């Protein structure tokens, strides 16, 4: 259902003059009416002409096009965001296809690497380990009191770029921009946070411009106690907040998720969001091919927390489709840098142990090696689906893709590693190596592939199709937790909007122009499932839909009325 338009009520504010112009959430720039200019002491502080937001957005678009590099475009958009947030979101929504890769992946990776160099203005909260005893005071300093969504990182595993220290702040800022642009969550409700626990990146430690704590990363008990202090302070300040963990290192990501997911409404987008969008993509791709996901054999390259999270969600989905757990697990094969995960492999991480194959079941495989490589696995398993979450470029070689295609006429290949410099294989190569037969979805955006005079659109398996809708659904329903079933409902809803399924052609995922519609549908499904699972108060479907409509923020200026503080 489309949101119902309603007249915005006037907003009563106490700020005036230059202070108002410096307030990004309230600043209208040249769009302040003459009456507002008189009432708020703005006469003479702005050019004479009163503009509409669309006129402002058109000027900003012209200026944007004058920048030649993606990082310069990113800096320009961040400057608008830090001076006039309403205009920023109107501009982004007008040009989402063009600007999403600039405000988030892949350009945000470069922005994180150069964070201290391109720093202009503070946004969000920086919590240094040295300030750990001032945690409550720090959160009290946040100017927006009604925070509903926090994205937090410690900067240790930023995309595929590794430890970026406080430069990782670019990720929470970018993620929350998408919560608003795609999911309609008011920017006044969002807070980006970086936990500055030091950095092991020697280049940053040696950089005179680096703005973070110049110290090796704290670890073990010190680290977990610090994170716990943060969580407890957040719970006290905003007990109903949705907390998203973002780009934590593999060794910490799953332990933190498992520790806090039943203590505070929280999830890890790298693990659960990536899994949800991948499963939604696979459900749609399987249906488009005339089958079910439970019929497919799946090979993963990359057995970290993200890869294993996707695998577990695939197993849950195939069980929903009728497989036993044992049968579901036998169809999923995990390969890391040491080869196929088997029950004979030493030093497995806890979350890997349920995803091993029994070595005794592989005795008839065509291989002489004790270490079973990706090529060995593809040759013997004959998979229908190949998923890359390795963070290493070029590992889907021509030999591997051709071997897969030899046994699978319509292979599904998903090189999901970010940014584009880390992708396991390019869509151009995959299409060519499979004679145009592969269905390709990537983690980073790629242009359509032209092969033998035919155009192949490349779907971006973008978490932005999932997490904004989850956030909106949690806020609208008042959910106290995010359950696995809520994530599964998001995947199923996403698959229902696949153009390839609906029309028999086009992308396997919706176009970005439809992302708000998809987010609202996911929000409804997530909210409904939250009610069914008892983590949200039950209401009628109409009441839930109305709550979604009421919470969906639009990038439009409101009339201001003056009041005293």
Swiss-Prot record:
Its EC number is 1.1.1.38. It catalyses: (S)-malate + NAD(+) = pyruvate + CO2 + NADH; oxaloacetate + H(+) = pyruvate + CO2. CDD domains: NAD_bind_1_malic_enz. NAD(+) binds at residues 157, 270, 418. Divalent metal cations. Prefers magnesium or manganese. It is an enzyme of class 1 (oxidoreductase). GO terms for biological process: malate metabolic process. The record marks 270 as: Important for activity. Belongs to the malic enzymes family. Homotetramer. This is NAD-dependent malic enzyme. It comes from Escherichia coli O1:K1 / APEC.
């Amino acid at each position: 259902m489309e949101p119902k338009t309603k007249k915005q009520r006037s907003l009563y504010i106490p700020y005036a003059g230059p202070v108002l112009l410096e307030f990004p959430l309230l600043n209208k720039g040249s769009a302040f009416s003459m009456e507002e200019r008189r009432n708020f002491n703005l006469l003479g502080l702005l050019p004479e002409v009163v503009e509409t937001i669309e006129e402002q957005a058109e000027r900003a678009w012209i200026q944007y096009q004058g920048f030649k590099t993606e990082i310069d475009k990113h800096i320009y958009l961040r400057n608008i965001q830090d001076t006039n947030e309403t205009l920023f979101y109107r501009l982004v929504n007008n040009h989402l296809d063009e600007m999403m890769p600039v405000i988030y992946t892949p350009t945000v990776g470069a922005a994180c690497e150069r964070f201290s160099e391109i720093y202009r203005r503070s946004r969000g909260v920086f919590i240094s380990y040295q300030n750990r005893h001032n945690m409550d005071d720090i959160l009290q300093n946040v100017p927006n009191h009604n925070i509903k969504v926090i994205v937090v990182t410690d900067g240790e595993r930023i995309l595929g770029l590794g430890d970026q220290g406080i430069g990782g702040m670019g990720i929470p800022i970018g993620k929350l921009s998408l919560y608003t642009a795609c999911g309609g969550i008011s920017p006044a409700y969002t807070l980006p946070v970086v936990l500055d626990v030091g950095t092991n990146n020697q280049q940053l430690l040696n950089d005179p411009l680096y703005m973070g704590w110049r110290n090796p990363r704290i670890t073990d008990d010190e680290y977990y106690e610090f994170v716990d202090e943060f969580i407890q302070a957040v719970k006290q300040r905003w007990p109903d907040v949705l907390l998203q963990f973002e780009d934590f290192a593999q060794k910490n990501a799953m332990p933190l998720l498992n520790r806090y997911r039943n203590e505070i409404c929280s999830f890890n987008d790298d693990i659960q969001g990536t899994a949800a969008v991948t499963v939604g993509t696979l459900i749609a791709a399987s249906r488009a091919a005339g089958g079910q996901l439970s019929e497919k054999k799946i090979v993963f390259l990359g057995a970290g927390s993200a890869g294993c999270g996707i695998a577990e969600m695939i197993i849950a989905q195939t069980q929903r489709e009728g497989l036993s757990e044992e049968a579901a697990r036998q169809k999923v094969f995990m390969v890391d840098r040491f080869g196929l995960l088997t029950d004979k492999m030493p030093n497995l991480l806890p979350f890997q142990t349920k995803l091993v194959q029994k070595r005794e079941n592989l005795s008839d495989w065509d291989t002489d090696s004790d270490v079973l490589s990706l090529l060995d696995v593809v040759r013997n398993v004959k998979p229908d689906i190949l998923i890359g979450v390795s963070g290493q470029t070029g590992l889907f070689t021509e030999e591997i893709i051709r071997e897969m295609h030899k046994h699978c006429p319509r292979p599904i290949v998903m090189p999901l590693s970010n940014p584009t410099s880390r992708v396991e294989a390019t869509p151009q190569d995959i299409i060519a190596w499979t004679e145009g037969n592969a269905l390709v979805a990537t983690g980073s955006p790629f242009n359509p592939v032209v092969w033998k005079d035919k155009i192949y659109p490349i779907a971006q398996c973008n978490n932005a199709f999932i997490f904004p809708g989850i956030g909106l659904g949690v806020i609208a329903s008042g959910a106290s937790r995010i359950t696995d079933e809520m994530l599964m409902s998001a995947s199923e809803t996403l698959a229902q909007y696949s153009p390839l399924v609906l029309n028999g052609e086009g992308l396997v995922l919706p176009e970005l122009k439809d992302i708000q519609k998809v987010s609202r549908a996911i929000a409804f499904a997530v909210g409904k499932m939250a009610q069914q699972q008892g983590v949200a108060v039950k209401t009628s479907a109409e009441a839930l839909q109305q709550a979604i409509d009421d919470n969906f923020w639009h990038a439009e200026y409101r009339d201001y009325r003056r009041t005293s503080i």
